[in-house]
């Protein structure tokens, strides 16, 4: 059973009851997942940007957008408009497929993994987790990478509070660390 199907059939009714909501449309849901990678070395090394774009495209299965500097910062040797990172926004079926792979395949492959921090919510039910190495994803071959780079994964939900967002992600299978 896919994550989307499981959400509709089991998670949504359970959250409706657990959060004591009156309408099925009030139940929090995942709106989008943003995968972002900032590349400081892209200012000097164009190959790293190209490699990052290819890696994110492999991981997400979607076209990657190159993010550019809004302002020139002399201390970082960056001019306005220079590429400094890349990002992908996933919605719909691709989002659910990515979340399922991330929760069930990628997270358990992290070394010394004891769960993700339950404190990384932003106050509005959105969750961000930083990944230190891209090789936890099964799509990335260790032999083909030039350097180990991390990324930020933000899960944007329709939850109004952190507790609602935490309940949603816990039901989806996100392994939160118990402090």
UniProtKB/Swiss-Prot annotation:
A Pfam family annotated for this UniProt entry: Ribosomal_L5_C
A Gene Ontology term for the protein's cellular component = ribosome
Swiss-Prot/TrEMBL keywords: Ribonucleoprotein, Ribosomal protein, RNA-binding, rRNA-binding, tRNA-binding
* GO BP terms, alphabetized: translation
Task: List the GO molecular function terms.
Answer: rRNA binding; structural constituent of ribosome; tRNA binding
Question: Does Ribonucleoprotein show up as a keyword for this record?
Answer: yes
Cite the record's note on assembly.
Part of the 50S ribosomal subunit; part of the 5S rRNA/L5/L18/L25 subcomplex. Contacts the 5S rRNA and the P site tRNA. Forms a bridge to the 30S subunit in the 70S ribosome.
Q: What name has this protein been given in UniProt? A: Large ribosomal subunit protein uL5
Q: Which organism is it from?
A: Synechococcus sp. (strain CC9311)
